[in-house]
Regions:
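A short beta-strand element within the Helicase C-terminal
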Residues: 411, 637, 641-661, 688-693
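SF2 helicase catalytic motif II
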Residues: 404-444
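Conserved interdomain linker/interface between the two RecA-like ATPase lobes of SF2 helicase motors
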Residues: 449-564
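Conserved segment of the helicase C-terminal RecA-like domain
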Residues: 661-662, 668-706
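Long, largely alpha-helical accessory region at the distal end of helicase-like NTP-driven motors
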Residues: 705-818
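Conserved helix/coil segment N-terminal to the catalytic DExD/H
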Residues: 372-411
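Conserved C-terminal RecA-like helicase domain
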Residues: 267-290, 294-295, 299, 315-318, ...
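N-terminal accessory nucleic-acid engagement/regulatory domains that precede
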Residues: 1-277, 543-545
């Protein structure tokens, strides 16, 4: 047996990037490019023995990682080794020969290795994307059910196997004593039965939290590993050994082990029962939720201290909602209420559905307040009585101005999308509301949890943390971990077809002729695609045909409906087929859309062929129905505006980015980072693919794309109020106003001092040149239309916004509240 030092030395060397002639990179390219196990003729040379090399490398890493984990426990090195082993086995099964007899065995190994590397969502997706017929052993089937978190299926399968007469101990003993049985077959039956019995114990442990059942399961699997070793049954040695490590890892990270047992102060009576119900309700879901991800564990450990204000910076899809739910559980167990502030109406509706699903089984009511800023009697009643309230800043601000006591018994405020602080009207409103909440005289009695996917690092994050924590010492919760990986590529039109590159390397993996030219139909003479938006739509249809949900990101809201018009037109002309097989799931959304928008509106007409058109200007009732369809996965193609970059959960397997500019200005890396985070759905996709669509100007577009990907980063965070004041002072200085001797008296008494003659002239020129809106030009290839940035706004407009804000700020800072 190797020592810990020997195993560590081996794994350190074996996990070096680029080892064995970049074997894992070549393996990924090999698996991505082939179809049913066969590479295209124009594929680059990837190695004649690549399949054997991948298998040998994968098994070596897996053996070493399990041995080191058994001796020294899980570590960063074992996690890296499991991940690299999983990469190798994934390459062996992805797009492989469907007739290969060992494809099921290798897929089980890939999924288990990903799980042990900390990527349970990728492990789930490895199994979730394939058909049932995998030529697998009963033990592998049981492991598959566990990884898919289908514990009902696991219980049913294990029960049937264990209750089958031929699998009983007496029958097996009789078969061995009779002398006629195939000993290897009998030993396989014993091993598979032991695995099933162990998983029955483990399922009970996950349901009840009883450590004795877990220990029994682990003991059975240790016996199975020894028996398989003695019998030289190599496949079942791997499976039973992996299963032993798998249940050990899952138990270690389970809610039973990670959700604190120590109640918050004052919650000694209610917390134990609520904790049990919380874990049980998550366990009982169709897809059981039984563990915490690496990104969630620190926040969970800090959750019991209800005076510990948290700033949580996790990537998109990394589990921020579960962090908020755990914090809410602690507060509710203390008999205090929870308030969740979401800056977008659509996000409020989405959050309401999520929290109702989690907390309704625990007996707590959930309501959301959004829409117009007024407050109805029903709104006020909900805000005063519901245990969990979700509200937009506008609604909450109006309510608190009417009655400050409405949230006196609220013990937790969750600030969703906490990065939305900046110079826009919505961002300033959010910032001012947060300041108002922090300045309440009872603020110390109320916990604040601030969530975001794109918070900055360094001093800016420290400043935000100090602000939220009112300068109390404490660190933010920060993690770069994502549940799925991502790949950046490009779709390039070549005159007759399009090449899809699956990374940014010119020598990397590609799919040839991913989109082919469509000949002209009827009386038309020109083939399709004819422009960038056509190419994006044809690519979306191709991805959808592969079962990959596709999101087209439009950098401008006014382009979104143009896509809807093109979808309808191309379907009508016969260049695209409907993506819907049955209109029943969308019937209600269609009716609501017809009522509010009319049957011919692009958002309604495109819905009829299975495409969602989403932007913030659509009527709220229709958006609610549309978002419900999206949450159910009923639509394969979505076209969305920048709203999604502000937190709306519209995740997809593929993100198509046809344009990189807005109003002649390139989108910023921080916005792109958040948008790109939408690619790759946990528990659905193994990886997310972000693709720039390039119909023309290929060389320039490719350069711009690489620069944008390289610039993708967290958001720069700075007070919107400070930004506006700084911009006004800069403008006044530029105009020479601040050079006047009595500048401040002049500014206080002369309205014209706050206006720039040059800017006023530009605005007048724009108004004079304004033309009536033309629906035929609302396409990304032809026009720009977007909100002005702070440095583009007229000085007078900035001053008006600051003027309105200052009154609210003074009130927030100085008013006496209860």
């Amino acid at each position: 047996m190797e020592t810990t030092e020997e195993l560590s030395t081996f794994l350190t060397a074996a996990t070096v990037d680029g080892i064995l002639g970049r074997l894992l990179y070549r393996g990924a390219a090999w698996s991505l490019m082939r179809k049913n196990g066969v590479l295209p003729q124009n594929a680059p040379p990837l190695g004649a023995t690549i399949e054997t090399d991948l298998a040998e490398h994968g098994f070596a890493l897996l053996r070493g990682a399990m041995a080191l984990r058994a001796q020294a426990g899980a570590s960063e090195l074992t996690g890296k080794a499991f991940e690299r082993a999983a990469n190798a086995f994934e390459a062996l099964v992805r797009n492989g020969d469907p007739e290969s007899p060992d494809r099921g065995f290798r897929r089980t190994i890939a999924a288990a290795a990903y799980h042990l590397a900390g990527f349970s969502a990728v492990a789930f997706s490895i199994f979730n994307e394939i058909e049932e017929d995998l030529n697998v052993s009963p033990g592998e089937i049981a492991i598959r059910h566990l990884i898919l978190r289908d514990l009902d299926q696991l219980r049913g399968f294990v029960r049937d196997w264990l209750n089958y007469g031929a699998h009983g101990d007496e029958q097996i003993a009789a078969a061995l004593q009779g002398g006629d049985a195939d000993v290897d077959e009998v030993l396989s039956t014993i091993l598979n039965t032991t695995i099933c019995r162990a998983l029955a114990f483990f399922d009970f442990a996950l349901e009840t939290g009883e450590v004795e059942s877990f220990e029994a399961a682990r003991g059975l699997l240790t016996t199975a590993v020894g028996l398989a070793d003695n019998a030289e049954n190599v496949p079942l040695w791997w499976i039973s050994n992996l299963c032993r490590h798998l249940i050990d890892d899952l138990w270690q990270h389970s809610l039973h082990q990670n959700l604190p047992t120590e109640p918050p102060e004052g919650a000694e009576e209610r917390y134990p029962d609520l904790r049990r119900l919380f874990i049980s309700s998550l366990y009982a879901r169709k897809t059981s939720e039984v563990e915490l991800w690496p990104s969630q564990r620190e926040a969970a450990q800090r959750s019991t201290d209800v005076t510990d204000d948290l700033v949580v910076a996790l990537p998109t899809s990394a589990g921020k909602t579960r962090v908020a739910e755990i914090a809410a559980l602690m507060t509710l167990s203390s008999a205090r209420r929870v308030l969740i502030v979401t800056p977008l109406r659509a996000l409020s509706a989405q959050t309401e559905r999520t929290f109702r699903k989690t907390f309704a089984p625990l007996g707590f009511g959930v309501s959301s307040l959004y829409g117009a800023s007024g407050l109805s009697a029903g709104d006020e009643d909900a805000l005063r009585t519901r245990e969990i309230i979700i509200a937009t800043p506008e609604k909450l601000d109006f309510a608190l101005r009417s009655d400050q006591t409405l949230i006196d018994d609220v013990g937790l405020i969750v600030l969703d999308e906490g990065h939305m602080i900046g110079p826009s009207e919505r961002e300033i409103r959010y910032e001012t509301l947060v300041q108002r909440l922090l300045r309440r005289t009872d603020a110390a009695e109320r916990r604040i949890v601030c969530l975001s996917a794109i918070l900055p690092s360094g001093d800016e994050l420290d400043d935000l943390t100090a602000w939220i924590r009112s300068d109390e010492p404490g660190e933010p919760v920060r993690s770069d971990w994502r549940p799925t990986r991502q790949r950046f590529g490009a779709l390039t039109w070549r005159g007759k077809d399009a090449l899809l590159r699956l990374d940014l390397d010119d020598d990397g993996p590609f799919l040839d002729k991913f989109v082919a030219e469509k000949p002209a139909l009827g009386k038309e003479k020109k083939p399709y695609p004819r422009k960038n938006s056509h190419l994006a739509l044809f690519a979306a249809w191709e991805f959808a045909s592969q079962g990959k949900r596709t999101l087209i990101f439009s950098t401008q809201a006014n382009w979104v409906e143009s896509y809807g018009k093109q979808v309808v037109d191309l379907c009508k002309r016969g260049y695209l087929d409907s993506l819907l097989e049955d209109e029943t799931p969308i019937a209600r959304a269609l009716e609501v859309g017809k009522e509010w928008l009319g049957e011919d509106h692009p958002a309604v007409a495109s819905l009829k062929v299975g495409v969602a058109i989403h932007h913030g200007r659509l009527p709220s009732p229709f958006l609610r129905e549309l978002e419900l369809l999206l949450s159910e996965g009923a639509l394969k193609v979505i076209v969305a505006s920048p709203t999604l970059s502000q937190g709306l959960n519209l995740n997809a397997a593929v993100l198509l980015v046809p344009a990189l500019y807005r109003a002649s200005e390139k989108i910023k890396g921080e916005e792109f980072a958040n948008v790109a985070g939408r690619a790759g759905r946990a528990f659905v996709d193994v990886e997310g693919l972000i693709v720039h669509v390039m119909f023309d100007k290929i060389k320039w577009r490719k350069k711009e794309w690489r620069e944008l990907v390289a610039s993708a980063k967290a958001r720069t965070l700075k007070s919107g109020l400070i930004q506006i004041v700084a911009e006004i002072l800069e403008r006044l200085s530029r105009e020479g106003v601040l050079d006047i001797d009595d500048a401040w008296e002049y500014l206080a008494n002369a309205r014209e001092a706050w206006r720039s003659p040059e800017e006023e002239a530009v605005v007048a020129e724009r108004l004079a040149a304004a033309v009536e809106y033309d629906a035929s030009t609302d396409d990304e290839d032809e026009t720009d239309d977007e909100e002005e940035t702070i440095d583009e706004e007229p000085l007078s407009q900035l001053v008006e916004r600051l003027d309105a804000t200052v009154f609210g700020l003074i009130e927030a800072l100085d008013e006496v509240v209860y």
